[in-house]
Amino acid sequence: MAALVLMMLDGVSADHLARHRARLPNLTALSERGTCVERLAPDLPATSLPGRTSILTGVDSAEHGVFGNLIWDGSRFRYANPDDVRAPTLTQRALAAGLQVAVLGYGMVRPEDATTFHHAWWANEMLQRARDRDPIPADEGWLRTSRHVDASGRLAALAESGLPRDVPDAYAGDRMHYLMSEVTGDQTMVQWSAALAAAPAPPDLIVTEVLTPDTVQHVAGPDHPFSLWALSYADALVGEVVRALDRSGRLQSSTLVVTSDHGHGPVERALYVDALLPGTTSACEAGVLYVAVDGSREAARVAERLAEHGIRRLPGDHLPAERREEVAAFVAEGATGFEPSAPAELAGALEGPSRYPSGHGFAPATPSDDRFLIAAGPGVARRRIAHAASADVAATVAALLGLGALGAGRTLT
């Protein structure tokens, strides 16, 4: 009996893996042992919750329902939560097949969809991260994950062995407290994952994530020494899993799948929505702007107004069918992000510098949004694949678990 460990490294791009191999020795070694997708297509938009959800479901946001970190629920834009996922997930399918499933810190999974579960360390205030200017309070879907107490006994046993019993409250102090809680939270989830994978009777599927690279890049910027450290930190956590499996004699019998939710790249400018569209209800989804509209006529009027500023309307086929008359999606070309308002010193401006020097979720086909996929383990071919679709991640993991087809993708291994 051996585990499949699925790790998501937030914000680690295809370009990072190609350009910084010396800083990413564990990912590089894994890529040489198995299958490596050099450029995995991002989702639309290439933001955190759509990316996490597509990894689990293998379908696009029109089907799984999570079309942004913020989604329109018919009355307001709010943060998406695990209860918003409409499509079957890897964890649900694995449970239904009688497999043991451990979800440790991976967002967008419900507690009931795992046999061993711990919420994401950031779940208590649902993405109330350092970069959120006006956080939306956590809703019940996220609070339910943070209230969950694992009943499997696995995490309690890990604590008895000397590993951390829980994670710090990231929101109990200043920004330094937040950063250290993030680094600690990521490490704890991976330490638990590594220990479970190396245990005598491991879960069949272990799903975890590392958030640090995304947060640090947003604040420090592309290729900043701090950002490069964050990439190396994520790589070192992958190495913890590899070493634990090696020490236990399970490395050759276990499967590791590592991917990311989106890439990262320089933000050249920001467009300020309160000046572009005063009085509208909108949500800034990185380089995509969602505007609540009352039907196609209002959407056309908004599109005409934004076109004056070089902003084009997206077709909207990535939106769930019932939202296409209620939400219009727009994008600006280049490395442009939308922000609710200008900083105080630029009050009233239409555009200016971004608050965050590095970002993601830009116009479709922006190379910096591309990500990667690495799979290594029994039966996984040693090969490199230039390009693959987002849906191929779930299809590949499902096949490796013997679950049959899942989603709209193809098996890559």
Labelled PLM ranges:
Residues 277-303, 356-400:
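Substrate-binding rim/cap in mid-to-C-terminal beta-strand-loop elements of soluble/periplasmic
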Residues 2-17, 29-30, 55, 94, ...:
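Beta-strand elements within well-structured catalytic alpha/beta cores of enzymes
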Residues 2, 24-25, 50, 85-92, ...:
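A structural signal for well-ordered alpha-helical segments within the folded catalytic domains
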Residues 9, 38, 70-87, 92-97, ...:
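Secreted, luminal/periplasmic, and some membrane-associated catalytic domains
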